[in-house]
Design a protein with these regions (language model features):
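Hydrophobic membrane-insertion alpha-helices, especially the h-region
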Residues: 16-32
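Secretory targeting signals
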Residues: 28-57, 127-175, 195-273, 320-328, ...
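Transmembrane helix segments
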Residues: 275-310
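Long, solvent-exposed extracytoplasmic domains/loops
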Residues: 51-143
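Short hydrophobic, aromatic-rich alpha-helical segments embedded in or entering the lipid bilayer
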Residues: 303-327
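Short loop-to-helix capping motifs
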Residues: 10-14, 189, 276-278
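Short helix-to-coil transition segments within interhelical loops
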Residues: 183-191
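Aromatic- and glycine-rich beta-strand/loop motifs that create alpha-glucan
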Residues: 1-20
Length: 347
């Protein structure tokens, strides 16, 4: 009865449909924009800016008349010009790697002041791409078949994690305490029934997540054709470079969401069962069911909560995702902790 009631409430409840539509929109909208979110675009912008600044201030003198700092700048400009003029991805990566390596030496010596972490990420990006054997670097999001929506999905899906089981559990409890259905008089279900409730919540939550992802996947499939599920990805985790594929990332993301939803769902079902017997009433039940999700609902917790460190990849906020996933991050999410990780080579 609980399982049938839950399914009926989900199908009839407007909140469930609204939640699914929001998920679908969040995962689908980014695909409609042919955004140049991949590393080479931003790297070339930075190099061009450096070359322009160097040409403006460079003295008209021979190499012997340059100071050590000016000689280093001239060397950087030479690598930057070579990268900008490169006709192949391999040539670009070779010159860019030399550029960022020399820039890194400047950060270490103190002769260059700026965002050292971003420079290190760019250097890691070049090295990882070179070692992965990629022969064609996508210039924009839609150049990567089928998976162009995946960077945004990785960035935003963890933010939706607390809301799905919270919504479904609340629907279950509020429905179970309505006078017209089970009301507060209903006895606590037996263990077998409790297990059915938990799995119903998990199944419904997973279905809603997949329903949210499906429109984006279908749209990307129609736009680009079925593409490179084995597209190589390299990322830093606990200070080590690890390689995987886009398909593995997508699978791991769904498993992580399912595991998190399961944990919250079990807590919610146990609490709701206890409160219906001891403190009957829809308001009390709903508040206690929501309790496991509260720590994850704050803005700061969504970005830095320890639970999100369980994900196999770095977690980026949606704002960073729109501009930097596919390139390299502007900061290390969770830096200073033992579980800090950073996406170095994007999709």
């Amino acid at each position: 009865m609980y399982c049938r009631l839950l399914l009926k409430l989900i199908l009839r409840d407007k909140a469930a449909w609204i939640c699914t539509l929001v998920l679908a929109a969040a995962f689908s909208v980014p695909i409609a924009f042919n955004s140049p979110i991949y590393g080479p675009f931003f790297m070339k912008q930075g190099m061009q800016g450096f070359v322009d600044a160097f040409n403006t201030r460079a003295p008209q003198a021979s190499g012997t008349d340059l100071s050590p700092e000016q000689q280093a700048d001239a060397e950087l400009a030479r690598y930057a010009n070579a990268a900008l003029a490169a006709q192949t991805d391999a040539a670009f990566l070779d010159s860019a790697e030399s550029y960022y390596a020399l820039m890194g030496e400047g950060f270490q010596s103190g002769s260059i002041v700026g965002d050292r972490e971003t420079n290190d990420a760019a250097l890691a990006y070049c090295r990882a791409l070179s070692s992965s054997g990629i022969t064609d670097i996508p210039a924009s999001a839609n150049d990567l078949p089928f998976l162009s929506f995946l960077p945004y999905a990785i960035a935003t899906a963890p933010s939706f994690l607390p809301f799905i089981p919270f919504l479904l559990s609340s629907i279950l409890v509020l429905g179970a305490t309505r006078p017209a259905t089970l009301a507060a008089k209903a006895p606590a279900p037996k263990f077998r029934r409790l297990i059915q409730i938990v799995f119903s919540i998990i199944a419904a939550g997973t279905a809603m997540l997949l329903a949210g992802l499906a429109p984006g996947g279908i749209y990307a499939l129609a736009l680009n054709g079925f593409g490179q599920i084995g597209y190589p990805i390299a990322f830093f985790h606990d200070g080590a470079l690890t390689t995987t594929t886009a398909g593995n990332v997508f699978t791991a993301l769904l498993l992580a969401l399912l595991a998190g939803g399961t944990l919250i769902s079990v807590c919610s079902a146990v609490l709701s069962t206890a409160t219906r017997r001891v403190l009957a009433g829809p308001l009390t039940s709903a508040l206690l069911v929501a309790a496991p999700a509260f720590p994850l609902l704050s803005d700061s917790a969504l970005e830095h909560n320890a639970a999100l460190n369980l994900l196999p990849l770095a977690v980026f906020s949606p704002i960073e995702a729109t501009g930097y996933v596919g390139c390299f991050p502007t900061e290390f999410i969770g830096s200073g902790s033992g579980s800090a990780s950073m996406l170095a080579v994007a999709l």
